[in-house]
Amino acid sequence: KRKRPHQPAPFTRVRAQRITDKEGFQTVSTGYLDYMLDELEIFLIPDKKLVTDAGYTEFRTNALAEYQDTIHAHGLVMVPVKQTKEDGITLIQGGDLLIHYTSENDKQEKIDKMRACILAIYKDATKDFFR
């Protein structure tokens, strides 16, 4: 298991941290949202970069499966690992997300979309805690 910096973030915003590992993967960590979301990791993969199943095994997953409808409602594409689309966003094992991008603009658009989605999920997940 690789170790990641773990900094609790304020509840009102999503703070992203960018980490590039030795294989050239970029990880955007959104910080600590709450115990239900645990730590959501977004992996950015340049277009055409091959990622094998073995490459996924190091990444920790979390319990996002129950929020799939929310994610779909925000227009994000999720496909099983075996059927990743180069321009899509992939949910792995009901947990972490992979974003495949084709350009800097495309990458930024997908990150912004994902951030909005995370905030929507977070608000939904915490609505009973913060009234």
Give names to the regions the model predicted:
Residues 1-114:
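Nuclease-adjacent, charged terminal/linker segments that flank catalytic cores
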Residues 113-131:
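Hydrophobic, aromatic-enriched interface-forming segments
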